[in-house]
Design a protein with these regions (language model features):
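Active-site and donor-binding regions of nucleotide-sugar-utilizing enzymes
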Residues: 1-130
C-alpha cells in the first residue's frame, strides 16, 4: 500500500480501536505479511511475485466499473496484462457489482475458460456498506 500519510492514517486506525497495522508495499514486512496472511482482500493487484498459498483465502473486488479499455483490448494489452490476469487467477473469489463488469473483466483478461474460483455478484464493499 503506498501511503500518503502513513503516520496520520495509522493514528486514525488506532484511535477507533482497530487492530490493524499499515505496511508499506516497499517494505520487506509487506512480503512477509502477504505470504502469511490467512485472508487477502484486494481491489487492484498484488505484486507480480505473489502466489496464493493453498491455505489462504483471496477475495478480489477490483476497483470500478470498466468504462475504459482493459486487458487484451489495451494497446500492448497482451504484453501488459500479465500481472492483473495472474492476480485474478489466484483469487478464490472475484466480486462483481453487476453483469456488465463481470462480462468485461472476464473477457478482457481471458478468464472465461481459465478461472476456476467462485464469481460473486454483489455490490462493491465501498458502495454497498451504506
Amino acid at each position: 500500500m503506498n501511503l500518503t500519510h502513513p503516520c496520520r492514517d495509522q493514528k486514525f486506525i488506532d484511535s477507533i480501536g482497530l487492530k490493524v497495522e499499515l505496511v508499506d508495499i516497499a517494505d520487506f514486512k509487506y512480503v512477509k505479511v502477504l505470504a502469511t496472511s490467512k485472508y487477502l482482500i484486494n481491489n487492484s493487484s498484488f505484486p507480480a511475485y505473489f502466489i496464493r498459498r493453498d491455505e489462504q483465502v483471496y477475495l478480489q473486488t477490483w476497483h470500478g466499473t470498466p468504462l475504459k479499455t482493459l486487458g487484451k483490448r489495451m494497446r500492448f494489452g497482451i504484453e501488459s496484462m500479465y500481472n492483473v490476469q495472474h492476480n485474478f487467477l489466484h483469487a478464490n473469489y472475484i466480486m462483481f457489482p453487476n453483469e456488465f463488469t463481470r462480462k468485461v473483466i472476464m473477457e478482457d483478461y481471458n478468464l472465461e475458460a481459465l478461472y476456476t474460483g467462485t464469481v460473486v455478484m454483489n455490490g462493491y464493499p465501498r458502495n454497498s456498506i451504506f
